[in-house]
Amino acid sequence: MTRLTYTLLIVNLAAFALETQLGDTQLAALLLWPVGPHFRPWQLLTSAFLHANPLHLATNMFGLWMFGRPVERAVGSLRFAELYGAGLATAGVTQLVVASLLTDKVPTLGASGALFGVLAAFAILFPNRIIVLLFPPIPMKAWVFVLLYGLFELISGVGGLQPGIAHFAHLGGLFGGVLMAAYWRREYQELLV
């Protein structure tokens, strides 16, 4: 059963519907701002349920549906919640650190960081599962896909490619997912000893 995955899908859709009804001032208070006069601690959570536009929402929710269900089935809903939270937290903190080094102080939003945590766990739990990209339709193993995606995010972040996308937040979420999966692996090995 993948109740949490479906719950997260519904919450994100509902948040987007609400987001369209908020005024700019109300919405700005929920975005993740760099540490400074506009930053509030709750933004680490609220920003992860907001999306810039329908395409942003659709791609994140497609990824959550595609990768979240098998991961939640494998680890259970409680651990999936821990994983999602770890990806969300490490993405947010990474974004705050990177934003403190930049002169352009813009807010961020989206579930991508948490999704990258789920993606990392998927690659660790199902490394040999074949994923076929939508465009171009190239089949590859899950671990290869995640490695290449992570490298793309690193190159894009360092090179300043695709401005307006929080590449380092994505990498932070990926790191959070790897940490959780490594913790589970250690715990599992301790049970075997």
Q: Residue spans of the language-model regions?
A:
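A detector for small-residue-rich transmembrane helices and their helix-helix packing motifs
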Residues: M1-V193
